[in-house]
A protein has these predicted regions:
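Acidic, carboxylate-rich catalytic segments that either coordinate divalent cations
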Residues: 210-247
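Basic- and aromatic-enriched surface patches that contact anionic nucleotides/nucleic acids
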Residues: 1-139, 220-228, 246
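Short alpha-helical "patches" and their helix-cap loops
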Residues: 78-82, 134-150, 203-220
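Small-residue-rich helix-loop
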Residues: 134-177, 181, 188
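Short amphipathic alpha-helix initiation/capping segments at coil-to-helix junctions
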Residues: 56, 114, 155-162, 181-189, ...
Length: 247
């Protein structure tokens, strides 16, 4: 009786649709389901945890991550999209649709659907504008930057830089940012994209002469393989590419 009191009053009016496993229930209302199924549903507990908008965002991220255990696990960027909502989040989602960026950065089918492309836009601006704050944890660095960026961010200037960088790279790299592989290595992406942006900020131009050769250079490979997320290696690979783009 108590369950009925707090239950969904119009449950009998709902019709099941698009079930892929229990297809025999498609088109049926709750009252037409087998009694044992109805009973199991009514007796099932649903755990609800409320994440307050007033909570510290890092706390919300950590709690969201702990709750994210069953079913399809969300990626860090999918969680960020839920926690750090606002203008900057919307901005990186829009830039992720940039055609030059899509053609230049090749991802797996799974990555195309799990927020990876949006995270790469986030990485671009985080390393471009706030590299000094990076220590070792990429996840924490991106979380911190996503929160900071929403407070004050020059959207028009940043969009211009992003579009110019990937327009130039797409023209210079018909096979995309790669070392002969089908998909773009994320560390190489950071080095090339951010290095190009830094060169553009300094000279308002990006020299791509010889890029298809030096992108496979042994020195750059050294900085983009192995323990690649040390601050020293992140800085060295970005500076290596910046120097090349400056000519």
């Amino acid at each position: 009786e108590e369950r009925e009191k707090i239950g969904t009053p119009n449950l009998s009016e709902l019709t099941l649709e698009q079930l892929k496993k229990l297809t025999e229930f498609n088109g049926k209302k709750f009252t037409k389901l087998p009694i044992e199924v109805q009973t199991k549903f009514r007796l099932s507990n649903i755990k609800v945890t409320t994440l307050s908008d007033k909570s510290d965002k890092q706390v919300r991220f950590d709690l969201f991550e702990r709750l994210n255990r069953g079913g399809v696990t969300l990626t860090d960027q999918e969680i960020r999209s839920c926690v750090y909502r606002g203008g900057f989040n919307n901005f990186i989602k829009e830039l992720a649709k940039n055609q030059d960026f899509i053609e230049c950065v090749h991802l797996t089918e799974r990555q195309e659907n799990d927020g990876t492309r949006e995270e790469l836009v986030l990485r671009f601006f985080a390393y471009l504008y706030d590299l000094k704050s990076f220590v070792h944890s990429v996840r924490d660095f991106l979380n911190d930057y996503m929160e900071k960026a929403d407070e004050k961010f020059n959207y028009s200037k940043s969009e211009k830089i992003f579009c110019e960088v990937f327009k130039t790279l797409n023209a210079a790299l018909p096979k995309g940012i790669s070392k002969g592989r089908k998909n773009t290595p994320l560390n190489l992406y950071e080095a090339v994209a951010v290095g190009a942006a830094l060169a553009y900020l300094k000279n308002e131009t990006i020299n791509t002469e010889g890029i298809e050769e030096w992108i496979k250079d042994s020195e750059l490979i050294k900085y983009t393989t192995g323990a690649t997320n040390t601050k020293e290696r992140v800085i060295k690979r970005i500076e290596y590419c910046k120097d090349k783009f400056e000519g």
